[in-house]
């Protein structure tokens, strides 16, 4: 079985190495400026099954400085950045983040 349901997270077989905190797309790859399925919870190797947070708060990697309350979307590397459009967003920053190594809480 490739996908199972576990409350606020699901599992999905990933098609590439994905680090914890990066956005995952619906095909099991890194979400690169596209709508994300959720956030990878642990570092996962290509072909393995990754737990993906799809609901609630979690830590995410940021690709640029964000402020508490900013709407977030995935950038080209799967990191969260401030949304520049109201078209869609993945969640809100629950705290400030200043660089790509900072983890923030997102929903």
Residue spans for each PLM region:
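Surface-exposed, low-hydrophobicity beta-strand/loop segments enriched in small/polar/acidic residues
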Residues: 1-107
